[in-house]
């Protein structure tokens, strides 16, 4: 990864902040009301940036589910409410803005301290569950600093209200604060996290907080340097080190991506270390896991063109192409870093003329495509065991069906370790509205490969086709095992059906996770 953008950003931050601090010290910037408004904007931006960075920080430990997001947002809102109340109380007891900037500096100091212990805290909490773990982590890592930053808005309103009408003052402060929040969201989402990673983002926010606090305290150039230089030093803190099992890791706009290895095994992890995407021996085609079952597709239907929604490490595509090298394959993957990893560390043949990888979100890509396919593979998860809800609804399956040739087959992996198989049943009930024939190949690890046909077919037909696999090929053992395990998938009456309007995938998955503990 090129370091040029980072150096440019750091240079911009250093020059801009130093110029502002110098201006204060030399008298070039004399408007205290303007300083207070800029402070409101910057602290608003830092709060939103911290909130976005928190989700990425938590992903490897608690996942990316809506429960993690909901819990985190609730705790942050509580911290902001506390900060607003504290800010109003302090403002009524202060004659100047000095105390405000002392509080902001204290927030930066706390952020600096947390940088050294945050990973240890998260490792300690990662098995505590989404709600409890996220709540405790947020209370320790983010609540103190966000409470301190939230002091700004009511304090600035009080400072400005001494010279202006209160209504105009409040409107002006919240306008500046909101503008800063918008800028913080955009800069963090589109630049800081994707290009620099969560760790460097948190370091930049820590330095920025210290500099904002210093800007309201300095009176001389020497004093400015005393506070300014340690703040910039935060940017030079060493990078995180990982265990020897981590072969490669990076952060993208969508995931924390890691390639793990042990002996001759290699596997891909996205966001949550407890759930791997593909595990395979180095240089091998077959994994011994559920992804091998996808290679049965060309033996079940005549296939010339295949669509793979979700790439992962490319295990399913690699094994399918080994069985049917003539297939024209379109693979859709939202994360370019995942596609890069699949080629570099797992041998996905991106250079082959019959394999096209499209970097896009699966459902919008499908809706915009005019192609039809004989075989569609669906294996998409985010934040560990959670299927994106909009990829398991009736409307999605109708869209997929409209891109399927009459003699085609849809194969989908559903991860469900619960005894009730609630998620599998709900997925089946939804599929049944579109595909008349459903079958499943279940494995003991909780992965279930669902076979959905757009026509009537019997389980005997499935077994007969599997029995035709050449006994001298590597696929023979997989086909024989599948023939023993395959069964018709019949959802119980009254089972939940997923729609775009209501798809409680996260709720069902959460129950599944709790029942498996």
Describe every region a protein language model picked out.
Residues 149-152, 286-290:
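Phosphate/oxyanion-binding active-site loops and adjacent basic polyanion-contact surfaces
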Residues 256-258:
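Short, surface-exposed charged micro-motifs
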Residues 278-287:
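Class I SAM-dependent methyltransferase Rossmann-like catalytic core
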Residues 2-251, 261-267, 272-277, 299-307, ...:
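Alpha-helical transmembrane segments of multi-pass membrane proteins
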Residues 288-302:
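Conserved alpha-helix/loop element of class I SAM-dependent methyltransferases that forms part
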Residues 456-517:
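SAM/dcSAM-binding transferase cores
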Residues 350-352:
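Short, polar/flexible loop-turn hinges at active-site or ligand-entry regions and domain interfaces
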Residues 347:
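A motif-centric feature for acidic-aromatic and gly/ser/thr-rich catalytic loops and repeats
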């Amino acid at each position: 990864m090129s370091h040029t953008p980072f150096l440019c950003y750091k240079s911009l931050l250093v020059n801009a902040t130093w110029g502002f601090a110098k201006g204060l010290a030399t008298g070039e910037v004399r408007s205290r009301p303007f300083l207070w408004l800029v402070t409101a904007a910057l602290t608003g931006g830092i709060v939103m940036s911290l909130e976005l960075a928190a989700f990425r920080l938590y992903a490897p430990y608690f996942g990316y589910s809506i429960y993690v997001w909901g819990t985190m947002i609730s705790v942050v809102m509580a911290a902001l409410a506390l900060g607003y109340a504290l800010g109003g109380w302090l403002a009524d007891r202060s004659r100047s803005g000095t105390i405000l900037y002392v509080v902001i500096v204290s927030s930066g100091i706390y952020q600096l301290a947390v940088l050294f212990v945050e990973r240890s805290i998260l490792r300690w909490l990662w098995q505590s569950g989404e709600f409890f773990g996220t709540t405790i982590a947020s209370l320790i890592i983010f609540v103190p600093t966000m409470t301190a930053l939230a002091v700004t808005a009511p304090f600035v309103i009080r400072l400005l209200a001494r010279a202006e009408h209160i209504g105009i003052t409040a409107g002006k402060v919240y306008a500046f604060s909101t503008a800063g929040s918008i800028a913080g969201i955009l800069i963090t989402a589109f630049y800081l996290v994707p290009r620099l990673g969560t760790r460097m983002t948190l370091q930049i926010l820590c330095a920025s907080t210290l500099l904002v606090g210093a800007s309201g305290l300095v009176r001389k150039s020497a004093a400015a340097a005393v506070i300014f230089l340690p703040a910039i030093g935060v940017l030079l803190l060493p990078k995180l080190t990982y265990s020897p099992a981590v072969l490669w890791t990076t952060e993208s706009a969508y995931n924390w991506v890691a390639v793990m290895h042990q002996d001759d095994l290699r596997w891909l992890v996205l966001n949550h270390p407890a759930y791997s995407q593909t595990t395979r021996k180095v240089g091998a085609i077959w994994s011994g896991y559920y992804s091998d079952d996808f290679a049965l597709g060309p033996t079940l239907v005549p296939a010339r063109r295949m669509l793979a929604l979700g790439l992962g490490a490319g295990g399913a595509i690699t094994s399918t192409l080994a069985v049917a090298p003539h297939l024209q394959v379109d693979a859709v993957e939202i994360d370019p870093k995942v596609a890069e990893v699949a080629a570099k560390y797992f041998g996905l043949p991106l250079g082959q003329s019959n394999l096209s990888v499209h970097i896009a979100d699966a459902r919008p890509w499908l809706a915009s495509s005019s192609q039809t396919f004989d075989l569609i593979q669906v294996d998409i998860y985010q934040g560990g065991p959670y299927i994106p809800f909009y990829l398991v609804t009736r409307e999605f399956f109708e869209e997929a069906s409209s891109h399927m040739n009459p003699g085609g087959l849809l194969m989908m992996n559903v991860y469900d370790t619960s005894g009730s198989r609630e998620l599998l049943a709900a997925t089946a009930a939804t599929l049944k509205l579109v595909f008349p024939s459903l079958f499943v190949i279940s494995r003991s690890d909780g992965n279930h490969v669902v076979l959905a046909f757009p026509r009537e077919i019997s389980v005997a037909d499935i077994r007969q086709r599997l029995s035709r696999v050449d006994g001298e090929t590597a696929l023979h053992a997989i086909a024989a095992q599948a023939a023993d395990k395959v069964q018709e998938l019949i959802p119980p009456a009254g089972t939940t059906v997923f729609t775009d309007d209501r798809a409680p995938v996260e709720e069902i998955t959460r129950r599944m996770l709790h029942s498996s503990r």
